[in-house]
Amino acid sequence: MNHKSKKRIKEAKRSARPELKDSQDWCRHNYCEVFSLNPSTVLDNVERVDAAQLTTEEFIERYEKPYKPVVIINATAGWPANEKWTLERLKRKYRNQKFKCGEDNDGYSVKMKMKYYIDYMEGTRDDSPLYIFDSSYGEHPKRKKILEDYEVPKYFRDDLFQFTGEKRRPPYRWFVMGPPRSGTGIHIDPLGTSAWNSLVHGHKRWCLFPTNTPRELIKVTRDEGGNQQDEAITWFNVVYPRTQLPSWPPEFKPLEILQKPGETVFVPGGWWHVVLNFDTAIAVTQNFASCSNFPVVWHKTVRGRPKLSRKWYRILKQERPELAALADTVDLQESTGIASDSSSDSSSSSSSSSSESCSEDDSSSGAEMMSRRKKKRRLCNGMGNGDITTQDDCASKERSSSR
């Protein structure tokens, strides 16, 4: 690794994780040596279905409507990404393009050129390495070529947030890439949206918990996690062993997945989930609002993003009047029954948010969270325009990429 590469990597690490003062802090737990990344340790107890044999209607009835996680095989067949997304080809094609690999303490993106990031990936011994989790590639003149390498699987093409306009809609798609031990800390995706994650290369370990799982049961405390409180590897080291004890409540036993190349994980709205990369992993993931989850997403958007909801409603009235009519029937005073994770209101660059409470509505999001943090947060992708929880949506999927 040349001097310039080392310098750029050091700068990115210092910006993304200022609480880690030196190289010793980054490797303090020696997870590179002592943490097992053996696939045989994963129970892998989630149902798998074949995209070639499952219609969209069957998927909606069997999985989406009942909020049931599932792993889909063959949904990525024919993707150019299967051949194009190798380290060698990505380094060649996007060599000097910058990708987000974290956030600083003011909420600004920390970015690294692909050539430097791959140098970092290939040599890191960090406990929880920096992780590319980039949501802006689709708007960039060169990086948007990534969009040509995959297509949204047939089950997830209902994209109702498109009716808010591209400039206003919350971030919803991410190109993700990271080395072993990188990952995404435990969280619930924002605004009641569901998600899909298609893995092109590598292996990912998932744990998922139902929406009614008590937050205090599955969150790492500051005393337990210290500076690595919000990291996926910390969660698997601290919390996961408890889930296997006889004393763990049986109704909150995790679903476990060892996601393999070519597999797509469906995460219904409200499900807690944590993801750890077992090896070099390259994937694409998107959040979505569909006709099935629209009542919940609408409820949470009105409560958490009121200005966005008004714009959304006006366009739905014109383009999808049946959904505007459905929105009129949603009782905003009743709980949705689908939890919200207030720690997803902030990236893990704001560790103070990790002790906030989880609730079944969005009544405490927004102004309260922002005033408690008292941080200057950049509006993500030019969105916001008066919505106080704009940053909440930007950071949910990016929590451990920035910490």
Curated annotation (Swiss-Prot):
Motif, Nuclear localization signal 5: chain positions: 373-378
EC number, as in UniProt: 1.14.11.-
UniProt short sequence motif Nuclear localization signal 4, positions renumbered to this chain: 167-170
Cofactor: Fe(2+)
Subcellular location: Nucleus, Nucleoplasm; Nucleus, Nucleolus; Cytoplasm
A Pfam family the protein falls into: JmjC
Domain JmjC as annotated: residue spans: 141-305
Biased composition regions of type Low complexity, renumbered to the chain: 340-357
Catalytic activity as recorded in UniProt: L-lysyl-[protein] + 2-oxoglutarate + O2 = (5S)-5-hydroxy-L-lysyl-[protein] + succinate + CO2; N(omega),N(omega)'-dimethyl-L-arginyl-[protein] + 2 2-oxoglutarate + 2 O2 = L-arginyl-[protein] + 2 formaldehyde + 2 succinate + 2 CO2; N(omega),N(omega)'-dimethyl-L-arginyl-[protein] + 2-oxoglutarate + O2 = N(omega)-methyl-L-arginyl-[protein] + formaldehyde + succinate + CO2; a 5'-end methyltriphosphate-guanosine-ribonucleotide-snRNA + 2-oxoglutarate + O2 = a 5'-end triphospho-guanosine-ribonucleotide-snRNA + formaldehyde + succinate + CO2 + H(+)
SMART domains linked: JmjC (SM00558)
One GO MF term: histone H3R2 demethylase activity
Keyword terms: Chromatin regulator, Cytoplasm, Developmental protein, Differentiation, Dioxygenase, Iron, Metal-binding, mRNA processing, mRNA splicing, Nucleus, Oxidoreductase, RNA-binding, Transcription, Transcription regulation
Coiled-coil ranges (or none): none
Enzyme class: oxidoreductase
Record PTM text: Hydroxylates its own N-terminus; hydroxylation is required for homooligomerization.
Motif, Nuclear localization signal 2: chain positions: 91-95
Co-factor note (free text): Binds 1 Fe(2+) ion per subunit.
Main location: nucleus
Gene Ontology CC: cytoplasm; nucleolus; nucleoplasm; nucleus
Name recorded for this polypeptide: Bifunctional arginine demethylase and lysyl-hydroxylase JMJD6-B
Name of encoding gene: jmjd6-b
